[in-house]
Amino acid sequence: QSIKKKIKLPNRIDIKGILLEELFQEQFFARSGILLEGISIFDDKPFAHKIGFEGWAMFVYSLRNKTHAQKVKFNYLLRGRSVIGLIKKFEGKHLSPGIILIPIKNSIIFEDIFKSHKIDYSKKNILLER
């Protein structure tokens, strides 16, 4: 309760206290959201950084059902040609053909790109050591 009183924010927020051991219990539903996307209210840094990790989204995608021209166009979009590619723009990493890592903070935007281009993909949120 003392933390709630010290925080001055324009909007009301709901703060719940939990024990550290609760955070790592499987039945605590908010744990993945906190570990992957949580931001500390004390220093405005990602919670994952405090425990030595970074939150990423790993996209595995396939261009198998696309024409050659569509594949080339999409690869230019990702990697860039005459303009900066989306992987670099969104601070991502190209791991191998069909696999990209994107920081969790940019993952929704990147997911929308796959959807808008009708690309078959799967997404896994992961923590990687810093």
PLM feature spans:
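Catalytic core of pol beta-like nucleotidyltransferases
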Residues: 2-130
